Amino acid sequence: MLESAYMAFSSKAIRTFLFTVGALVGIVLLTALALLLFFDINGYKPRVEAALSSALRMTVTIEGPLRLALLPGLRVTLENVRVRNQGAELALVQEVDLAIPLLSLFEEKIRYSNIATKGARISIERYGDGNGKRNNYERQPTDSRQSRPLDLPKISFAGLTVVYADKQSESQLEFNTCKGELNDMRNPGGEPFLKQLSFRGQFSCGEVRGKGKGSPATDLKFSVVAREGVFDFAPITIQAYGGQGSAKLRMDRSREVPTLELSVTLSKFRIEELLKPLSSPSSASSGKSVSGPMNFSTSLTARGASRLAMRQSAQGDMSLSGSNLKLAGVDLDGQLRKFELSQNLSLLDVSALLIAGPVSLVVTKGFELATPVRQAGVSTSIHNVISRWKVEKGIAHAVDVALTTDENRVAVQGNLDFVGDTYQGIVVALVDANGCAKARQKISGPFNKPVADQSNILVPVGPLLNLLDSAKKLILGSSDNCEVFYSGSLPSPK
């Protein structure tokens, strides 16, 4: 009897519970349906724009309509959302889809379970330090306001394009056909925003195109994890200049002074692809070129609140190496055999290749293959290249920088000042089997306009070779007793 009564009560309780849940769900659905039928959301567009502008501390306008949808779940869609800061456009998003849990309509604050963007184009403009212009991504000062708490399960990006323009160096990178997502974005509120931000995510881009005529890098992929202001980008992979690149980047914004740690490896890339964006019409018409596979790696750390401070504190190592390269249009060994180091042959022809290691496009953009006269149908085989540098306080010091051909060895000493963008005591020398300098050439000036000193280049020709060889020994001294210019890892050719 008691068992029957208990079972009847349990069955009734279950039916009552299910009826209650069903009624609540029905109320929520009817409420959402009423919103769709009777609520004109576009009338609230000015308030939405004002709320977004206040949250971002930028100017946000919604140029398209706002739409409500019920399935699959309550969603609000915004079309053609434009974000401007200090008069400059920062972003234009074709569509923003906001997924809202139905039960959150009855809470004090509306929550979003997902934000999906489509067709976003983000334009980042960076100016130099101390020029009075604010970067277009920097928000207005907070005054007494603080960032609101953030708890967003997911935000996704489809059809994303990002354009980064450095106004000081006039360089630009464009990331196309990108997609990705960020998950578990959280911030307890307060300032500064980045110091307390946490999330995880992954992104990919079909191509990365620079300003100029070079081939774009492709297949960029990276993951990112942020924990209370520390951002770890790893692994990063990319196809660039015909080679495979990988990198790791850590940015620590949790401290008073931000810090950065970067390591990059680019394996088996083609040096001709790297130098292609740097060539001018005159150098292209000269018919001279260098080609072959090379490897590059660097590991750097820096700290500072500005780009200048980062440069001044940079330290680490850089290395470039390669084998079996070809310098077309120049018979370097044939010319050196006669010591014709004149306007018709300059050590700048190979110094750009040696200096390319630590500075890549930054420094070598001032160099072209310097010899004005091309030798038709000839070339130079470069057997090995090593370019190792130590970076301290923003200055790269040559550690082991040299190359070898069939008959000769060329080496470099000196420093590269990344802070002032200048060459410091760079000397390119032709060295003998003992590492002694047989001829030297000094390079000075800014990175983009290097100046080569021709005053101490030997210019012996034809029948004067023996006489000038004796004069060379008087000036430089015997190779057995000379001051060693190069004692690095590359042996002299046999």
Residue ranges and their predicted role:
Residues 112, 117, 122-124, 175, ...:
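Extracellular beta-strand solenoids
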Residues 68-74, 101-108, 339-372, 434-436, ...:
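Alpha-helical membrane-targeting segments
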Residues 124-127, 271-275, 327-330, 452:
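Outer-membrane beta-barrel proteins
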Residues 67-129, 143-165, 185-197, 308-310:
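Flexible beta-edge/linker motif
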Residues 415-478:
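C-terminal or late-domain output modules
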Residues 2-57, 478-493:
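N-terminal type II signal-anchor transmembrane helix
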Residues 136-170, 174, 181-252, 259-262, ...:
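Solvent-exposed beta-strand/coil patches in large extracellular/periplasmic or lumenal scaffold regions
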Residues 54-61, 393-395:
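Short secondary-structure junctions
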